Amino acid sequence: VLAGGGHTHALLLQMWLMQPRLRPAHTLVTLVSRHSTALYSGTVPALVAGLLERSACGIDLWRLCGLAGVTFVRSEITGLDSQARELHLEGRPPLRFDRLSLDVGAVTAETGAGSAASGAGAQPVKPLEPFLDWLARPSPGAVVRIRGGGAAAVELALALKARGFVPRLLLRGEGLQLGSAAANRLGEWLLAEAAIGLERRAAASAAADLACTGSRAPRWLAAAGLPVDGATGRVLTDASLQVRDYSGVFAAGDCGLIAAAPRPASGVWAVRAAPVLAANLQRSIEQPEAPLRPWRPQRWALQLLGDGGWRPGGPRAVAFWGPLALGPSHWLWRWKAGIDRRFLERFANQASMAPAAMACRGCAAKLSAGPLEGALARLEGAAVCQVPAQGPAADSVAAPPPVVAPTPEDAAVVATAADGALLLQSVDGFPALVADPWLNARLTTLHACSDLWASGASVESVQALVTLPEAEPALQEELLLQTLSGVRSVLDPLGARLIGGHTLEGRDGAGLALGLTVNGRAAPGRHWPKGPLHPGDVLMLCGPLGSGVLFAAAMAGAARPEWIDAALERMQRSQAPLVELLAAYGCRACTDITGFGLLGHLGEMLGAGGPGLGSGALERQGFQEVDAGHEGGTEVACAWAAVAGAADARPVCTGRSAGAGAAGDGGAMRPLVVTLDTAAIGALPGALELLEQGWASTLAPANGRALALLQGPIHLVSAGRPTALKALLIDPQTCGPLLAALPAERAGSALAAVHRAGFAEAALIGRVQEGPWPLPIRPA
């Protein structure tokens, strides 16, 4: 387990990617970080000054881990049990390890007495992410008081000057603390040139806005019993980076300190520690009896500080090396900027090493609609053909019930309880969408439960089928624990139970996969089928689309980490609260948008039993009508089936509705038309951009057959980006949103209630009407 996404660990992964022989053989490696982007500290002052964008200052840990074959776990580390060899994480079970490497960075050593404005403590500069969020609050021209007098405080003050603030430094002593007399003199000259005031011997109670007072390691390291430096809390190691008296535990970067050669926290030493850490992790696993490689870091590290470019002529920099100080000059800035750029390019250029197009996972790994429905149609036909004739009385023998339901529903009704409630069951599952087994199980469970929520049911129990990769028994135990804990993380808040299951060991390199059988109950009168839709119904989509294309691009290293973070945050939101809300506002048909995309699942709703796609509509669209022989029947069941002689599959009406037509229509039913407002259909961040670039899930081409509906019962009111929006309509979803049909007069109130419940991205996207012409979307 690599705890933390610091510079040493990032370089370690890059080394493993470029030189796989350096990676310990037959080892599952997991990296844990609170953020999916590791900010490179050397570029942060330029970011504060406005010289760089935030996207240019980070290392994409999602992509780096994926390319290096490392499991990425995004979580806050809360503690360490060194005896049980477990790393404790926030809100999820601990991770057990055989080897542990600590590179968790540092936090600001102290925060001062408080802000003059609010009385709250000064904002620490470390961790960097909360500080950068704070940076957006003050208005340009505001006075920003910074407690601190080291190199970081000086560079930050100059960057804030360039940003338009009025910084002041609060010094604990009489002067700066830049490591040498020459550096202190040059630092004071830079600050005086920028008219940045110094408050010498500032009282500890003096109000400050920012704290930049040095760093110390997170306190949970000392709480775990590890040996630490008393002043900084950094974990004490020997020359091999192994923690003193703790075999198999290593520490590097700002949280580690070689006891025999202490050096201040600096990115220079963090970078140079990476080859040593790589060698010793490999040696400790593959050659546990061999001595570890020692390292003695250089005595001094070059420091290059930028002035933020506050004055005309462009940014400058100064250089400190031991007792020497040089600058300021523009060429020193160009040198510094080049060093930083080349460091980050080592990681950005790894995108070219992404594998060629790979089959998508999650719900995009499901079978496409064509072969699925073809097999079911043949199964039904085979069952009918196998009914034996019984002589002259055979004509009077009742036909057997259908092998499969004529209209596929999200969940099957298996029984009716004594109180009239319906007992429902559904099954779902797929190969792991993400490498983190706990998160993958959580996503799979939410995805499976949505079939019951779309049917108006609550979830009561689940059984699991877990396929584990071939591995050592202890590792399989850990993977199974993490998987079942992820399932429980969804079920426990619902009051549902994991009542059983089965395990398999995969063969031929098969990875982790999870399937779930989900059981639930729908209150009397609440069961929602997929249809029929009724004229006047308004369609509510309860969330954004785009997970398919995002994870397809992520597999190739083309999705930005913040896009994946946003998608996973949305996908982990339980839709259970929507059941009561939609019921209260008269929901009468519902489905969840999953593998076949919005168009495919809306097509199922249109084809569901009742006056959905009337025969007249089908004939005008060139679809084949089949008389199922139910004379006088009032139910029309339309399903996707193969049309004889056609290369593709089209909707086929398998029944006829009698007496439902309007006057002058010859008794034929009027067709239903759905008008979709594409401007109202939400997209996850990054989804439309990727679709415009040509990215698509591997299931999307098969889903493309649903685009034929746009030539028939579904009309689009298009906004801009028509190509991307059409592609979004067939994008397969994992943990996709519910799509509900509501009475027009209650749809607006229902939407407001859904927004209040936390589903801010829900929208009214369509309206159902009779007739072939596009109609207004939103109810009056």
Which residue ranges define each predicted feature?
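Residue-level recognition of short, solvent-exposed, well-ordered loop/turn junctions
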Residues: R96, S139, R272, W528, ...
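Helix-biased detector of long, well-ordered alpha-helical tracts
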Residues: M353-A780
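A Rossmann-like FAD-binding core segment of flavoenzymes
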Residues: F72-L80, L95, A162-A239
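Beta1-alpha1 glycine-rich phosphate/pyrophosphate-binding loop at the start
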Residues: V1-T71, A116, I146, A151-A181
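FAD-binding core/adjacent interface of flavoenzyme oxidoreductases
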Residues: L67-R147, L210
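C-terminal auxiliary extensions adjacent to catalytic cores
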Residues: G309-A354
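FAD-site-proximal beta/loop scaffold in flavoenzymes
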Residues: S118-G141, A206-R272
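A conserved FAD-binding loop/helix module that cradles the flavin
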Residues: C255-I285, A290-G308
